Amino acid sequence: MRKILFILLIITMAGCSSKKKDLFEVIIYECEQKEESLNLQFEFKGEVELPLEKICDSYKLLQDSIISVMFGEELVDYPTKKALRVYADSSFAEYKKVYEEIFDNAQCTMHDAQLYNYETDIKGKILFYDSNVLSYQRELYTYAGGAHGMTTKTNYVFDIKTGKILTEEDVFGKGFERKITKQLIEKANILRAKGELPEEDELYNSWNIIPNGNFALTDSSVIYTFNPYEIAPYYYGIINIELKLEN
């Protein structure tokens, strides 16, 4: 038997100024699905912030690009609330398939097992925009049993007129790697001195700290995001290194 409970909310952002109501909307979808015959429980929460027409004339291109990086290119043509629902359903189906295979390989019955909980929480938000670019962040939390879940953050910089994802080379020009790497290592050493990064060893050291494509722009800086295990053990969390654009 499969039980589904879902809540769908469409919220227009209300900020300090009434203008924000016309600039962005936030669409939230929550569902809980149970497959009692398999002893499975799945919880999903999705939240996506989208620009509206007053941001720019090409807002639809931006929306399509955001939906593509959030949920997959195949869901771009879906209404946003349906894209969230389809993404949730496919996540549950994939989770269920994995556990069916586990139990088949273990040669035990589903009723012999404990209740397996799986959680997915995906959130997309606008970090910054101006007349040229829009910085966006996709945050994904998953829990599939074990000691803890995993959160990752992925940043995207879009050309606000075309919806195209901009690369580091698009923003900084050719040959950016050496200069950006030098600045990242300098900032990382400051974090290390504060205890916010581990002391260097064979696994985590300056060789790991390079431009990784996971960057966002603000009006005065570029922020590089390093997810757990990239440059530090899990318990250090997500590391952001901010570089001033003037440099």
Predicted regions and their residues:
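C-terminal motif of bacterial Sec signal peptides marking the signal peptidase cleavage site
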Residues: 12-15
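Positively charged n-region of N-terminal signal peptides that target proteins for export
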Residues: 1-4
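Intrinsic disorder/low-complexity detector
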Residues: 6-8, 161
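Exposed boundary/loop context
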Residues: 8-9, 230
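Compositionally biased intrinsically disordered regions enriched in Thr/Gly
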Residues: 17-247
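Residue-level signal for mature regions of secreted extracellular proteins and peptides
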Residues: 9-10, 24
